[in-house]
């Protein structure tokens, strides 16, 4: 089963990389796929185009994010169809985020049904409680405390936390008034700046290499994805 899962993940990485290359003009240097606990997560490395490199040197990161959001809006339906047609994976919603300074990114999806291909050791109850405490703290500081938080560890280096019911009234009004893109860009920066990485690293006893956030504003759901450093 492990060999089959690895083969599927490698095939997903190859097909996804080709599709991203067709939309962005350059694919990621490497893709790492995790398929577990009803989630598909793809970690991208060395993912930046020559034009984006120029804009980044000119401190135009926001312009890059805006452009990528437009491209991803067109790309996501094709990604969803490809995963379903080639691998039988039914994604409910696709999420994504970037770390332009590191030239990294993540694309992930929550899957329909119990599509559980494998499991990894769960977080300890103490770790989970403390992680949720920090997620509640920074989410409350940015908007309001979540009604519910659920976290799973997909593998040695990937943790995903789901937050429900986090939007405040002004955010809901901005979304209904057509300012969803502006809200997304602002919240990305805000949440990453206020999360206490060193505290979480002390709980996990593992460094955090990358941290990503995204939302389904219509369902009032937010996610945090932690990519951990490889254990030495």
Annotate the PLM regions.
Residues 99-156:
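Surface-exposed beta-loop interaction hotspot
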Residues 1-4, 27-28, 63, 81, ...:
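A cross-kingdom feature marking solvent-exposed beta-strand/loop segments within repeated
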Residues 70-114:
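Hydrophobic, ordered structural segments
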Residues 199-232:
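Extended, charged low-complexity segments
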Residues 34-51, 137-175:
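An N-terminal amphipathic alpha-helical segment
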Residues 1-49, 53:
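N-terminal ordered "arm"
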Residues 49-63:
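A low-complexity, Ser/Thr/Gly/Pro-enriched, surface-exposed linker/loop concept
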Residues 72, 76-79, 165-207:
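Short, hydrophobic/π-rich interface segment
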């Amino acid at each position: 089963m492990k060999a089959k899962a690895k083969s599927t993940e490698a095939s997903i990485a190859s097909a996804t990389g080709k599709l991203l290359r067709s939309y962005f003009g350059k694919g990621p240097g490497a893709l790492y796929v995790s398929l577990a606990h009803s989630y598909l997560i793809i970690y991208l490395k060395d993912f930046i185009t020559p034009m984006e490199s120029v804009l980044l040197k000119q401190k135009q990161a926001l312009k890059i994010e805006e452009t990528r959001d437009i491209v991803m809006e067109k790309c996501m339906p094709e990604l969803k169809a490809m995963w379903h047609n080639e691998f039988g994976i039914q994604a409910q919603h696709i999420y994504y985020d970037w770390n332009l300074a590191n030239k990294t990114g993540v694309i992930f999806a929550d899957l329909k049904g119990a599509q559980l291909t494998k499991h990894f050791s769960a977080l300890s109850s103490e770790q989970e409680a403390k992680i949720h405490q920090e997620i509640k703290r920074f989410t409350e500081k940015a908007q309001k405390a979540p009604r519910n938080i659920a976290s799973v560890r997909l593998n040695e280096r990937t943790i995903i936390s789901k937050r429900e019911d986090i939007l405040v009234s002004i955010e809901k009004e901005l979304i209904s008034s057509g300012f969803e893109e502006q809200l997304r860009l602002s919240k990305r920066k805000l949440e990453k700046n206020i999360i206490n990485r060193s505290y979480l690293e002390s709980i996990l006893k593992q460094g955090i290499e990358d941290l990503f956030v995204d939302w389904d504003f219509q369902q009032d759901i937010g996610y945090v994805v932690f990519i951990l450093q490889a254990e030495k």
